[in-house]
Amino acid sequence: QQRYLNAKRYVKLAIVADRSMVTKHNGKLKKLRKWIYRIVNTINEVYRSLNILVALVYLEIWSKEDLINVTSAAKDTLASFGNWRATDLLKRRSHDAAHLLTNIKFDGTTVGKAYVASMCQQDSSVGINQDHSKINLLVALTMAHELGHNLGMSHDVVNTEKQCNCGTCVMAPTISDQISKLFSNCSKNDYENFLTLYKPQCILNEPSKTDIVSPPVCGNELLEVGEECDCGSPETCQNPCCDAATCKLTSGSQCAKGLCCDQCKFSKSGTECRAAKDDCDIAESCTGQSADCPTDDLQRNGQPCGNNAQYCRKGKCPIMTNQCISFYGPNAAVAPDACFDYNLKGEGNFYCRKEQATIFPCAQKDKKCGRLFCVLGPTGKRISCEHTYSQDDPDIGMVLPGTKCADGKVCNSNRECVDVNTAY
């Protein structure tokens, strides 16, 4: 648990500057970009204390017209920006969170708004920020504050039972000239709780050099174009393989970090760098030519797993019993074959396939690839065939593709029980 909490995180940030920002900078896009690069450098500095690096991986400037309706109603603007990000921006450019920068003044004293504990979520990993000051630092701290909400942080409240007692930390409810670059203990706890509860996956991946669109800054701990390594400032760098002042490898070093970097040299070929997680995963080993562990690879589809009783599919070992347990708890088991006869009827929720409104009953050989039936606890004389159905997602409660349905056979994506050798 502690290792998971202490792991370095990377927020790959996309920033969108709207038309009002272009007008504010008199159409000088170069000047506007510089303003935004400075903001991101500050945000990255602020977050380094939490072992988070923030990298700008995309910058979009709406120089002709706004692609959403940006208004003084912050709540509405946030909702439409989130919707636009999910339906448009995410399809074009991979990133973890998107923030809007606008010169439109929001109602009341609001200078920013963001969804809380939403990092990595499709439509809510967003924030909106007003470019409310001539002082770059104050705008940067506003965006850092809104990003804090995405990462699960609520406002610091002074003199409550929580005793954050930091009136000037990043998550202070109101902005002031005394604002600092520090996070309160409350913010740190909120962030750790968010990691534990939501387990956001997207921020575990480091951006590649070429993903980062802002000019490289030696000493910001992000590996950027033109750098061989970046271990932070000369004062804080603790990596003997990297020269902090130049971001070049020290003399005789082959690497500065990586799962296959050992004491500044590439690990020997064959050194295991990622263990197999389970039957359907493959262990990876170093090549001897690189500091990186090869891409995570999976066992081939159809490879036996689960004590040779099941078969792998896309890195998972789909077991019918486990599917019952996930719906009904640890005492659940797969129902007797008689229950699966319901799937032969093709009535109600019992079928193999549904296309538009047409229901296709299962053929006798395919009945264990349709609706899943389970029993709860020990069965008496009467068996109740438990099943699950969802109006929203017709696939919920169906036997998962790749599940064994007979000896040497698995359910394919058409819910037919086919020979495992022809299924893949």
From Swiss-Prot:
A motif (D/ECD-tripeptide) lies at residues 279-281. Its EC number is 3.4.24.-. One of its GO terms (cellular component) is extracellular region. Expressed by the venom gland. Residues 215-301 form the Disintegrin domain. Glycosylated. It is found in: Secreted. Optimum pH is 9.5. GO terms for biological process: proteolysis. Ca(2+) 1 binds at D96, C202, N205. The active site is at E146. It is an enzyme of class 3 (hydrolase). CDD domains: ZnMc_adamalysin_II_like (cd04269). Keywords: Disulfide bond, Fibrinogenolytic toxin, Glycoprotein, Hemostasis impairing toxin, Hydrolase, Metal-binding, Pyrrolidone carboxylic acid, Secreted, Toxin, Zinc. The modification Pyrrolidone carboxylic acid is found at Q1. Glycans are attached at N69, N185. Ca(2+) 3 binds at D281, E284, D296. Binds 1 zinc ion per subunit. Residues 9-207 form the Peptidase M12B domain. It comes from the Eukaryota. Belongs to the venom metalloproteinase (M12B) family. P-III subfamily. P-IIIa sub-subfamily. Monomer. This is Zinc metalloproteinase-disintegrin-like brevilysin H2b.
